[in-house]
Amino acid sequence: MEAIDELSQLSDSMKQAASLLADEDPDETSSSKRPATFLNVVALGNVGAGKSAVLNSLIGHPVLPTGENGATRAPIIIELSRESSLSSKAIILQIDNKSQQVSASALRHSLQDRLSKGASGKNRDEINLKLRTSTAPPLKLVDLPGLDQRIVDESMIAEYAQHNDAILLVIVPASQASEISSSRALKIAKEYDPESTRTIGIIGKIDQAAENSKALAAVQALLSNQGPPKTTDIPWVAVIGQSVSIASAQSGSGENSLETAWRAESESLKSILTGAPQSKLGRIALVDTLASQIRSRMKLRLPSVLSGLQGKSQIVQDELARLGEQLVNSAEGTRAIALELCREFEDKFLLHLAGGEGSGWKVVASFEGNFPNRIKQLPLDRHFDLNNVKRVVLEADGYQPYLISPEKGLRSLIKIVLELAKDPARLCVDEVHRVLVDIVSASANATPGLGRYPPFKREVVAIASAALDGFKNEAKKMVVALVDMERAFVPPQHFIRLVQRRMERQRREEELKGRSSKKGQDAEQSLLSRATSPQPDGPTAGGSLKSMKDKPSPQDKETPEVSGLKTAGPEGEITAGYLMKKSAKTNGWSRRWFVLNEKTGKLGYTKKQEERNFRGTITLEECTIEEIPEDEVEKSKSSKDKKANGPDSKGPGLVFKITCKVPYKTVLKAHNALVLKAESVVDKNEWINKLQKVIQARGGQVGSVSMRQSLSEGSLDKMVRKPIDPEEELRWMSQEVRGYVEAVLNSLAANVPKAVVLCQVEKAKEDMLNQLYSSISAIGNERIESLIQEDQNVKRRRERYQKQSSLLSKLTRQLSIHDNRAAAASSYSDNSGTESSPRASGGSSGDDWMNAFNSAANGPSDSLSKYGSGGHSRRYSDPAQNGDAASPGSGSNRRTTPNRLPPAPPPTGSAYRY
């Protein structure tokens, strides 16, 4: 009994462990939530096998009906609990959490009445009882109907027998021991427990087969593990089964009547089965065998349960670490916790901002995406439209002609356009502010400590957001100051350079016009001198000057100028040819192959005609073209360089220059201008015409190209004194100013993000913790205590995990002790010797055992014929078998322990062979 009590404690521990592993509340009673199957005992057997009698013997009271009228017709489940304070005769029935003391007879008759009602029904609902006694082991007994009854089907059997830890009792009467191989109960047990690790064989009604030597021989063979092959791995126990009824009938007022009956049962069995192992006889042996099988099942389950408990313990400890310690109830402790939480929040904030965990990348994305796009989308074209420029200049200069003093108007235009940059700068600040606010919220959510105190978490987020608002205002002031700085001071050198470039352009135009006039006069003088010189081979000298001028010279007839350019494309839109390109490094000329695409408006060149990839490409839309004198190009070259690097430049007007309309931009690579020289005048004129056509078609500017025509002295003076076009001059100046504004906007696009980072991002990194500390320190103790109030859900979770942790430690310790004991017992049993053979005492030979099982195979023996093939018949049993000792007329027919001599055991060394 002590072994069963110990296993009961172990079963409770394993039930609690299963509840913990299933994450159930340890406060709730796990017995009702998760019933264990370690202590379940299911009785299997045919009608009349003595199942109820065996279970009555385990209970210690005849509560289950037996006999013909007490046949089990529905599953009866009795949940036993042992209470040592009760007397051996007391039985406490528990119904709906209420306890009531009942007698075994009243309980038995109540069950018999319930079973007899509706006997014709096929399906029966199970009957559940909860009993407390001082004699019963803490087991859950399941008394199933006879397996040969119609109401028993596979589903009913599986409902109780399929549990992995339920102990299966295969109960057969002694008279049928020789037919054990054909027992249905044994077949069902083998089906659900092939390895027989939770099966116990019970041979009942030994006293009724005391005179049948063959049956007793078969019983002794089974008890000695020498029965059929399918029975050798099952532990067998022999019982009489009616010791409880006998004790009840003979009991007086003594408390030890049950113990006396169990000892008498063991002595009677020893006298009947003299050759059987004495450790397998009687109710005490049955309890010990049950304890052994239950311990074996628990031994198999203990390692996995312990492993699960260890994993669960680690999870609980991690959860407790995440939830933190319990709050200290003091003003200083509360304030210290608040400041520590501020430090944790600041660490998470910095990690999200600079570590890449949060939305810190969105700050850089704003600088590289939205802000530059807003700067590019400013309406510069509308503000630098010529009509708008005229209006601004007139409003700024009053009624004075704007060509006399346009600087004031242009300064005003610069201020107006740069004012537009303030809105994108402010939007950039707002966008970064939103990103920082999101980072604050994400950091607060990622701080474990703040999750325990939602009010304080909201306070920290509010303080951090207020600090970010201050940083935002400072950043807006800074970026607006950057724009105002550019608006307030426009460098005077810019306007000085404007005037200088304008005067330089006028000077070049006048020089070009002067050279054209001088060339015309030289040509006239040359014609006059040739006309007056003698002509030996020509016609008669004389004639007018006009005739001499109109008549072409023979040299011109012999060498007509032909263009060397090539055209290609469906519409002749591609023009290619050689040009001399002036090198900025060597100050010399290099012959290059140039290709003009009129559709794309681009001019590219290669070193050789065979090359496929351009060495440089010029976008003509942004360029201007003008013709320059060769003297200006060649004035820095020595005569030796001219002979070595350049072609003969005696031909007039072969050089022209391509520049960008915006002075600050380059034309090709890092060059502000591209100086080219044609190989002939025809090539130059064709190149210039086509380049002018492309530039004009794409809205570019064409510089002044000198016309090669003879002008008189008067016409030259008239051209020099011609007034400058005011609109053209203003257009040119507005383009120069636009270039300056674009340069300033590009500078702002680079500097505004720096100001934003300084005033918002870096300020948040450096001053966020100080802002939190100063704000929290300014709050009173009462306010701090109201904020540091732990969430009740978190508090309950911590308490629950603390209870689980304590229970886990307790269960792990208890189960580890049992596991170590089981391991020690297993090693001891492995080292111990096998049980000795049954003692020899003369008498029958081993052939009696073999004949017993052979006769079972050939047919029933004579000694068993009076009971039929089904064993002992309940129909002819006396009322004493039902345990009703007080019934009328049953006193004389009471069955007592027979006083017979048992058959002699087989001789020493004999064994049954199959």
UniProtKB/Swiss-Prot annotation:
Region: G4 motif, residue numbers: 204-207
UniProt binding sites for GTP: 45-52, 143-147, 204-207
Protein's UniProt keywords contain Acetylation: yes
Domain of life: Eukaryota
Ranges annotated as biased composition (Polar residues): 523-535, 826-839, 852-866
Pfam annotation, one family: PH
Entry's EC annotation: 3.6.5.5
Region: G1 motif, residue numbers: 45-52
Consequence of substituting K51E: Affects the trafficking between the Golgi apparatus and the vacuole
UniProt keyword annotation of Metal-binding present: no
Coiled coil: 781-805
Catalytic activity from the UniProt record: GTP + H2O = GDP + phosphate + H(+)
Region: Disordered, residue numbers: 507-570, 629-648, 821-914
Leading EC class: hydrolase
Family per record: Belongs to the TRAFAC class dynamin-like GTPase superfamily. Dynamin/Fzo/YdjA family.
GO molecular function: GTP binding; GTPase activity; lipid binding
Origin species: Arabidopsis thaliana (Mouse-ear cress)
Name under which the protein is recorded: Dynamin-2A
GO terms, biological process: Golgi to vacuole transport
Function: Microtubule-associated force-producing protein involved in clathrin-mediated vesicle trafficking from the trans-Golgi network to the central vacuole. Able to bind and hydrolyze GTP. Binds specifically to phosphatidylinositol 3-phosphate (PtdIns3P).
Gene expressing this chain: DRP2A
Lineage summary: Eukaryota, Viridiplantae, Streptophyta, Embryophyta, Tracheophyta
